[in-house]
Amino acid sequence: MASKSSFMATFNIVTLMLMVASSTVTARPLMKPSMGTSSPTTSLVYRLKLDEDTGYCWDSLMQLQHCSGELILFFLNGETYIGPGCCSAIRTIGRKCWPTMIGVLGFTAQEGDMLQGYCDGNDSDNNGEDHALASSTLPLSVNFKTTVVRSSASPSNP
């Protein structure tokens, strides 16, 4: 019985010490205290470039969501048509916003360069800018499959 009572006494003392210790410790604040305005480097608007001049970056990113089927077919089947809206979004993100964002969408840097190169090649307003594909340091390794499309409808005989 003596060992049981000494165990309980030790347990109570340790518990009491932990409670006292935890009451004297202060936790760090979850957010930095702000003095009127937040610093430019910690501001969410600054980090996401959400000022009035870069709203088109987010619009372009949303546009890429709508043309993801075209981009997948471009690489998967070798279908060589990407619409002008999709190309505009690719150029905007690659040149004016976040060049690495195309990689975040699941494409490699080489595939992003290929998309930009394709869109630059079809851009009539290129203004003499270098093509992203031509300036890429990565070797091309995408082999497109040739597909034959056959019409299943037979011509009608009068």
From Swiss-Prot:
Its main location: cytoplasm. One of its GO terms (biological process) is double fertilization forming a zygote and endosperm. It is found in: Cytoplasmic vesicle; Secreted. Keywords: Cytoplasmic vesicle, Fertilization, Glycoprotein, Secreted, Signal. InterPro entries: EC11-15, Prolamin-like. Glycans are attached at N122. Pfam families: Prolamin_like (PF05617). Restricted to female reproductive tissues, specifically accumulating in storage vesicles of the unfertilized egg cell. Residues 1-27 form the signal peptide. One of its GO terms (cellular component) is vesicle. Involved in the regulation of gamete interactions during the double fertilization and to prevent multiple-pollen tube attraction; mediates the redistribution of the gamete fusogen HAP2/GCS1 to the cell surface after secretion upon sperm arrival. Belongs to the plant egg cell-secreted peptide family. This is Egg cell-secreted protein 1.1. It comes from Arabidopsis thaliana (Mouse-ear cress). The gene is EC1.1.
